[in-house]
Each structure stands twice: as C-alpha cells, then as structure tokens.
UniProtKB/Swiss-Prot annotation:
Zn(2+) 3 binds at C308, H310, C328, C331. Disulfide bonds: none annotated. Zn(2+) 1 binds at C269, H273, C296, H298. The lineage of its organism: Eukaryota, Metazoa, Chordata, Craniata, Vertebrata. This is V(D)J recombination-activating protein 1. It comes from Sus scrofa. Zn(2+) 4 binds at C358, C363, H375, H379. The record marks W896 as: Essential for DNA hairpin formation, participates in base-stacking interactions near the cleavage site. Signal peptide: none annotated.
Amino acid sequence: MAVSLPPTLGLSSAPDEIQHPHIKFSEWKFKLFRVRSFEKAPEKAQTEKQDSSEGKPSLEQSPAVLDKPGGQKSALPQPAFKPHPKFLKESHEDGKARDKAIHQANLRRLCRICGNSFNTTGHKRRYPVHGPVDGKTQVLLRKKEKRATSWPDLIAKVFRIDVKADVDSIHPTEFCHNCWSFMHRKFSSTPCEVYSPRNAAMEWHPHTLNCDICHIARRGLKRKSQQPNMQLSKKLKTVIDRARQARQRKRRAQARISSKELMKKIANCGQIHLSPKLLAVDFPAHFVKSISCQICEHILADPVETSCKHVFCRICILRCLKVMGSSCPSCHYPCFPTDLESPVKSFLSILNTLMVKCPAKECNEEISLEKYNHHISSHKESKETFVHINKGGRPRQHLLSLTRRAQKHRLRELKLQVKAFADKEEGGDVKSVCLTLFLLVLRARNEHRQADELEAIMRGQGSGLQPAVCLAIRVNTFLSCSQYHKMYRTVKAITGRQIFQPLHALRNAEKVLLPGYHPFEWQPPLKNVSSSTDVGIIDGLSGLSSSVDDYPVDTIAKRFRYDSALVSALMDMEEDILEGMRAQDLDDYLNGPFTVVVKESCDGMGDVSEKHGSGPVVPEKAVRFSFTVMKITIAHGSQNVKVFEEAKPNSELCCKPLCLMLADESDHETLTAILSPLIAEREAMKSSQLMLEMGGILRTFKFIFRGTGYDEKLVREVEGLEASGSVYICTLCDATRLEASQNLVFHSITRSHAENLERYEVWRSNPYHETVDELRDRVKGVSAKPFIETVPSIDALHCDIGNAAEFYKIFQLEIGEAYKNPHASKEERKRWQATLDKHLRKKMNLKPIMRMNGNFARKLMTKETVEAVCELIPSEERHEALRELMDLYLKMKPVWRSSCPAKECPESLCQYSFNSQRFAELLSTKFKYRYEGKITNYFHKTLAHVPEIIERDGSIGAWASEGNESGNKLFRRFRKMNARQSKYYEMEDVLKHHWLYTSKYLQKFMNAHKAFKNSGFTINLQRSSGDTLDLENSPESQDLMEF
C-alpha cells in the first residue's frame, strides 16, 4: 500500500509506485541522528526551543521516534528522479548562512586585539570594543588628562588599530582582560615594563571554506564519526530545509513586531510627541516615514542622527539605549549616546517648516512645527494659573533647596516660555534674556554691588583677566605657549576660576597686534611691491631664484614686509598719536599729512648656536634688522607740530624687529641677497604716501628713514668701504690715518651715500686708466657697491666701547712705562695686562673679559678706576696726565651720550670744542709714544666730528644702536624659550614674540598690571634706603616677574 506524501513536501508530481513506504520514518531518523556539521546556529536553536515551549511539537519530540531502536536501518533505494534546481540552490544558500553563523559564534570567543580565546585566559572578564570606557579606566584617563572617552579611541591610541570600521561578521566584538591590563599599564605611572600582547596587529578575514577560525574550533573536540545515511533522499533534505526556513521567517517577523512594540513602550512619548496624522498636508507615505521617528513613529522632535545614518527623537533613542543596550534599534549597529549628532541643517529646515493642525478644541489653526510649542503654550496660559496650590501631602520645598533635576522639572514651563520669547525677540539668545532679567531684579531690590559684578561679566569684564592682559603677562614673563598653558590649567584647577584666558583667546588678541591685520593703501602704489595688505611673516629668501650657477645661500631668514610692519607699529601707537594731537590743541579729525621719522638699526651677533632643531646647516651667527619710530609731526599751517616723540629711544621696548637671519654679517653675498628686497621696499616708500584709517578717519603719512644704528664694521660693509684697518680711517670724511693723527680736531663730514655710489662706478670702470694705488686714492677707499643708505654719524654705544678699549690699552702701557721703553716684547706686554686685570678685579670688582662690552666700558671709564690704576704707576707726573685725560673725556662723554644735549648738558656742549682740543694736545704730547703718526678710528670721530653732528641732528645718543644691542639679548632669550623641532618655525616664533614684546599697547596693560600688583604691598622706599627704585624695562629686570 503506497503512502501518499502531503503536497507541501513538493513530491505530488511523483507517482505512488515509486514512493517508499518508510519515507516518513527515514525523515524522523534523519532528524534524530543528524550529523554535527548540520546543526543549527545557536540563535536558531534558541528560537526553536522557544517555539517548542509554546506547545508546537517538533519531529524530535515525537514519541514514535523514541520507541524505535537506534540501530535499525531501512533499505531505501536511490530515487529515480532529480531534485528541482531551485531546491538545490536554496539548500546551498542555507548552508552558507549556517556556516556564517557558526563563524560568528566562534568569533565571539576570541579577543579583537590579540586573537586569544577567552577560554584560555585566566580572567573571565570581557570588554566591548565599541563601548564607552569603564569607570576605573575613566578615572585613570582623567588623572592623566587624556581626552579619550570610548574604547575605539583608546585602542587606536595604544594599539594603532582602527575598530570603528569593524563588521560583526569579520571582527570579534570584545577584547580580553590581558589587553585591558596592557592599556592600564601604558597610562599608569607605575615603574613596570609594558609588554604588548602581540608584535603586530591581528588580521581578520571574511569566512571562507578553509577558514582558520572555524578549522581550529572544529579541531577542539574529537567525536566519533557517524556513517551518513545513504538512503536519505536529497530531495527530502531540501523539503525539510524549506519548511524550516519558512518557520524561521515567521518567527523573525513576530519577533520584529514584538520588539517594535516593546520599544514604543520604552519610549512612552505619546503625550509629548506629535502623531503624523496631525500633518496639514497628505504627504506620500515614504516622506512621512522619513520625517518620523523609527522608534515611536511620531513626527521627529529634537531629532538626532546615529553613526549608521538613522534618525530618531532624542528622548526615544536615549531611553532605548539605556534599556536595550548600545546598538541602533533599526540595524543593531553599535551605537552610543556620545555618537549622536544633529542632522544636516537642510533636513532640519524642511522639518521645521512642516504645517501641523492644532489639536486643541475650537482651534482650527495650522502652524509650522517650529512655532508649535509657542502656539500650544498660548492655549495653556488662558486655562492655567501659575500660583501653585498645595492640596496637602508632602510639603513643598523651596526652589533653591531642590536638586538640579527637580529644579528643571519645576521650571520647565518657564524655561519654554523664555526660550519662545528669546527665539521671537532676541534671535534665540536665551542666556542674555535670563541675565538681563536677573540684573533687573537685582537693581529693583537695590543690590547694586552684585548687579555691577553681573554687568561686568555680561560685558566680558568679569573676575578673569582680559586676553590682552594675559598676552602681556605671557610675553613680558617670557613664557612659551606650552608654559602658559600649564600655568593656565594649574591656576584654573587650584582656584576653580578662569583667571587667565585660554590660548585661543590670546591668539585672537595676537592677530590684531601683528603685521598683516590692518588694511592700508599707498598713493601712488609702491613700485615692485604687492598691493595685498594681509601679509604676515614671510621667508627672507622668497623671490630668490636658486640655480646651480647662483651663489648658494645657506641661511634661514624670516621677516615682515616693511610697509606692513610700519602700519602695524603706527596702529599700535594710535592712542599716543591722538593724545599728542589733543595735547597740542589740535583737532582729532585732522588727516595730516603726518611725517614719521624712523631710525634703522642693524647688527650682527656671534655664537648663537643651538643644539636642537632640524633643518639645513646654517652659520652659528645671526643678523638682526630693526627699526624705531622716533618722532611724528603733522603739518599745521606753516609749521610742523610734534605729536609724538619717543621718550626712551635706546630702549629695547621700542626697537621693533623687522628681519632675523642666521647668517654671518661678513658674508656680503648673503647679506645683500636677504636685505635687498627690504631696502627696495624702503626706497619705494620714500616717494609715496601711506593712506591709513586711524581713529575712524583716513589719514596720510610720509616716512623719513635714517640709518644710524650701525656699528663701524657694518657701515663699511653696506656702504662699500674698506675694512676698519684701512688707511682711510673715517666713514664720515676722507682723512687718512696719518692726516688724522697730525690734525686731530679740524675735520668736516664729506662722505655720503650718493658720493660712494659715484666713487664705486669710478672704481669699477677706471675711466682715467690709473694704477691700483692711484685709483684707490681717487675713490678714497670705496671698493664695493653700496646697497644700504646710512646717515654719516657716530654710534654712541660703539664709540664708548672703542674709546674704553683704547683707555684700557693706555693703562697697560702706563703701568709698564712704555714712554721709556716703547719697544717692549710681547711677554712684557702680557705681564702688564695681567697686572692691570688683577688690580682692577681687586679694587673695582671688574672681572677680565675677552672682548670689550658696554657694561665693562661704563665701569672702566670713571675717576675711581684712574685712581686705582695710578697706584701701579710710580711717576707722579704720569698720574696728573692720566687724571687730566680721564677728566676731559668724562666732560665730553655726555655730549654724545645724551638724547638731547642742549637740554641735558648745555655746559658740556659749549665747552666741547675747548675740551677736545686740550684732549688732542695731551695725546700729541704726553702720550706721543702711542699716537705719533697714528690714531684710533673712534678717537678721531670723537674729537673731530661730534660738534658737527650735534649741530645737524641735535643728538647723537638718541640715534645710537643701543636698543638693537639690547634686542640681541632678547633674541637669545626668545630663541631658548621657543625651542622647536624645526628651525624655520623657531625663527617665526622668535620674530613674532619679539614683535609683541615691543608693543606699546601691551606695555600699557603690563604697566597697569605691575602698578596693581605693587599696590598690594606697603613699601616705604625713602625710609629704607632713600633711593628710588629703578625698575628698567630690560630682560634682567624681567627675571623678577617669572612665574
């Protein structure tokens, strides 16, 4: 008797005679003795177990199978028909899915970082790869001030593994306790060695037939192999798999529906969110779905977007993540509250413009979603009263005694009203509305002190310092950015208040003070200079075409563009200029023209080598070019009125750096290559006028440049003259050394930049076909092309240094009585020097130096020093000569040292000619052994040219290079402070910091800060010493202010 199969099995097309009677039993037997490799994934098994518990018996639970013996075999012949190709394909795909599920189950037992199995490690603890860090790690990171808050960031920082792009089917989702311990040891300060669990990152691949992970998992346990049932039909297997898949799809659909209902219950937002049914327009279903929350299916309220690009209401997604775990409710991709972001603005604008119907009765108004809350609150105001009536129960607490959460709950209605008002009237500025309301309440209750403090905070002038004050403190105390940031964090952590401003606020304040911020214009435009005004620090070598044939320039140079730097300097002095105009009874609206006199200085520095920084091999010497705004006048009527004059022209606080280069000043080619563009800008500015808006009015400025801050070595270099040992002794006149020694006093200034250029052309072309000596005598020592125009003058500082060096030599010769023995040996002269050094150290506390400097010269040139030296000289006659020589020198010195000799030392100025002639007479008689037929360069300039320069310029000391020399000390200090890995950036830091140090705007803040700081101390200086406290603005005095 044939047994007919049900049509659902797919065999109804086969005739009854070929169907075996024991097919049903064979199916049960296959289910009972199924091979291990055909087992289902754990998730499917659990689902089937749940279904079976609901009262749906499966084949395994059938009592008929349990009664049969296990060893019974059926003789089922091979079926005479082929299975349908569709069934074979579905069976193959089901096998693939089953293998993938087994692969994922194996992955869950492995560590994502090191690949070890959780079963082999000693600890059973696991940590999610995509989760936030645990409490212990968070405490450790907070101590170390690290910003990482999630495991992906921490794993990327420690192991250099990016887990954000992981896929669950390829990568494990957890890591082991060993890797967790490794990260802890990495960030903890315990003195133990840290070993990485792996030398290289673990590589994970998709599942394949020869998958290593599944192969190792199968090899774990040995089972007795079972003989496959050869009588089982492939067609029956396909039929069973299809039935199983149908059941699984049904269960998944039911689970999906139940999970969606569960999420709606968790969100519980029916009272606060709007249903899509309230939309005024009947939109397509897809559009409604796109603007609806995928959890509660309401219109999106305060929408947020996950990393997998699904959009939810903020309240709904946060509640679901808290209850159901850290995964997206739509796609189950890992998701955390920190990953939520606001959608794009275009989507929000579309959402806010949707029109919805008002759900209130007797209101048929349609309003936009953006104004819905304000509209609904207007309905509530008419019905509700704000006076709370306590109807018994728990007593009502005061607002200030509540927790923050309870305060939010109680003030929720008020907060919504304030927000609606701010959105409507103040552009959404809720903070300003609340602060103003609080301020009005304080004023109404006569609490004006608190009101004044609140008003200061609202204006940004609270208890903290202004960014400009903080910048002034940082610059004047020589703090680098990193040092200031450490101080800022320390003060904020200790006091709990933000007294100092963060670095980004200081950088915004810097931009206003640095060149390249203020717009300006030149009339006519500068020749060969760009018209752009936003030019900051530029490379000093920019514009140089470097080729194989060119001279190799091994240097690093950074500079400002000359015109941009002058504009920044003038804007920095804006208050001083306007105040000067008011002091001269001039109107503020006068637009000029103003005439600005600029002193230029340039000097070389030796031994600036540093042992750090990458970059090219550059000379261990530097050259600095700087300028000082000396005087500003305005044309008023027929005269020029002075509105500004630099009070301390030789201070480093007013000597602004323009160009820094690591080069040797003796390297003529490098010097001309870097300074030539700067000189070209200077020459272009001479014939043009600057149009600059100052005080809201467009004003005109003209510039006069005076190159006086050069020592004699650099003057000879840039004016094309021979070196200092030349026969032509002077840079101001054509006298030779012999002529100057025979005529010590009566000379006049004859040299000029134009004349030097003409003489260079004669030297180059030799038009008269003369010999070298004749040609040299004709051009008076000009041997190179002059490229910088300098003013024929004397540098007061180097004049002091040169004259002190000569007096130091005279002291040695007098100790050895060289007037008796002019041909002494070198050993004797060294002995005289050693005797002098020892005596000066003992009597005057002057330590011997290798090279004369300004401080040593200042201490050496005194009457006390002469008296000490006279103790070593036996002859009384020589005592008198030496004392008279020093006395004459000390009478002449104030004339070239003072900024305005006509006011400061008029008597010395009147007697200068007499004193210089007497000084020259002493040199030619009493000290004839030293000055017969020769004289030093600075003695010649001191005796012959000082009165003429004073008559022409009014001063020598004010135009000296002392400010630039002090700037050299600042350069060394800034270079140590701003040590960087790259020498290029280091030079930029030094130039920028030095420019800020010379800012008058910052100096005013710093002076006010000093005065405020000193006002807290009661120091009676007159009672203690009777002297005034002299705090000079120099790097040495600034050491007192270091933090």
